[in-house]
């Protein structure tokens, strides 16, 4: 369930993804026009082709998607659920396709887009083929077909691999988010029959792993006992990238001020403060008062540069003679911090909520140094236009907040 950040996989093949983009466009056209005849005209296909496309989509969905009257055909509740996801998918995809060539909106296929995504991520046709489980010539041909319609190369050859052009990067990103919408359409449709389909992928910082997730997962299992949950770990920057490209559904941890980029939104759950800690046998353990000068002569275990905790740590020593300590170990691992504090005279700077359990068990000790002005928001970061599935929404509603007390 829990794993470190790795090369992102191509999105799993969902039931709705099995249909061609042309079929899905015909599905939307029927809903928009209320007429198979008119939809066929708009999509430049025959009426039997549209009828066949609708039949196949309904069979895959396992649900009737349309109601019919003598005057028109219209989406029922299940059809509206699917249409919402398909519309969102093309909302991502069509602008990026049109930027390369308007013809791509007609000719591009799911297989071609998956090949583009894989080559962009691996920067190599052979590695992309391995990732997709295809032959190298098949991947090369799929990308070449996109390039032929676009009338331009999508990749530049460099000594280090294939680098996607800017329009190709935009299309690969849009395609990834579009395919994610089609994958989540399966989950939305399953909700209508009380089935469990899909998964939740969470980007987690150290505080989220130690405080937020255990309680939320335990509560979630009472409602969704079988739905897979995957935890992705890594530096904040990597997790943010994974969030923006759709590899994780949401990111839990310390929020940034200002928000890191315009296409994400942050929601505050509560505030946490920083605490300075030592091992229980440390020379400073048990002291009633500690001055800044007492802290500068010991080695430290601290978070990496660029993190909120590290910023507060540096501020502590901003007025100290000689500045911040130089003999530091940079890590986000509370386990490594705990062991270093236990076996040496290292001091630590970490989240109070994250350290509470260790302090309560007597594995480390909070130092009496005023950190009341280090309050920082903890919460959820999501893509700005994200539409959660019912399961994802339930999980977010179950995220714990700490009891009201002075941190």
Residue positions per predicted region:
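Short helix-boundary/capping micro-motifs
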Residues: 30-44, 119-133
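A short LG(V/I)-centered, amphipathic sequence patch enriched
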Residues: 58-75, 147-164
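Short beta-strand-centered segments that line the small-molecule binding cleft or hinge
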Residues: 107, 192, 216, 237-274, ...
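Central regulatory/effector-binding core of bacterial HTH transcription factors
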Residues: 122, 127-144, 148, 198-257
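Flexible hinge/capping segments at coil-to-helix
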Residues: 194, 263-300
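Hydrophobic hinge/microswitch elements
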Residues: 235-248, 254, 312-366
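Secondary-structure junction motif
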Residues: 284-285, 299-320, 388-392, 396-398, ...
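A late-sequence structural motif
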Residues: 365-407
């Amino acid at each position: 369930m829990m794993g470190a950040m790795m090369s992102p996989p191509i999105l799993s093949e969902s039931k709705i993804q099995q249909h061609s983009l042309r079929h899905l466009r015909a599905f939307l056209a029927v809903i928009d026009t209320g007429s198979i005849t008119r939809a066929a005209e708009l999509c430049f296909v025959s009426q039997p082709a549209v009828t066949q496309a609708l039949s196949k989509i309904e069979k895959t969905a396992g649900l009737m998607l349309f109601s019919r009257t003598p005057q028109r055909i219209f989406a029922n509740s299940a059809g509206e659920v699917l249409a919402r996801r398909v519309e969102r998918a093309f909302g991502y995809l069509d602008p990026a396709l049109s930027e390369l060539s308007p013809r791509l909106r007609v000719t591009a296929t799911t297989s071609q887009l998956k090949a583009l995504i894989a080559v962009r991520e691996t920067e190599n046709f052979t590695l992309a083929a391995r990732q997709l489980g295809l032959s190298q010539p098949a991947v090369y041909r799929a990308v070449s077909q996109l390039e032929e319609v676009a009338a331009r190369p999508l990749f530049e050859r460099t000594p280090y691999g294939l680098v996607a052009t800017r329009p190709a990067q935009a299309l690969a990103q849009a395609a990834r988010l579009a395919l994610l919408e089609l994958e989540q359409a399966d989950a939305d449709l399953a909700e209508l029959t009380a089935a469990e389909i899909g998964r939740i992928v969470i980007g987690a910082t150290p505080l989220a792993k130690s405080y937020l997730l255990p309680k939320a997962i335990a509560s979630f299992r009472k409602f969704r006992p079988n739905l897979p949950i995957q935890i992705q770990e890594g530096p904040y920057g990597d997790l943010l990238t994974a969030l923006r490209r759709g590899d994780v559904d949401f990111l839990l941890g310390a929020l940034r001020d200002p928000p890191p980029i315009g296409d994400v939104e942050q929601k505050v759950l509560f505030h946490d403060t920083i605490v300075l800690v030592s091992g229980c046998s440390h020379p400073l353990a048990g002291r009633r008062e500690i001055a800044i000068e007492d802290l500068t002569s010991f080695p430290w275990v601290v978070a990496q540069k660029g993190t909120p905790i590290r910023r507060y740590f540096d501020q502590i020593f901003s007025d100290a003679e000689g500045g911040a300590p130089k003999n530091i170990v940079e890590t986000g691992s509370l386990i490594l911090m705990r062991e270093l504090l236990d076996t040496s005279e290292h001091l630590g700077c970490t989240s109070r909520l994250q350290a509470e359990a260790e302090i309560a068990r007597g594995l480390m000790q909070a130092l009496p140094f005023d950190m009341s002005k280090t309050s920082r928001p903890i919460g959820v970061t999501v893509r700005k236009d994200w539409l959660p599935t019912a399961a994802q929404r339930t999980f977010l509603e179950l995220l714990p907040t700490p009891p009201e007390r002075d941190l």
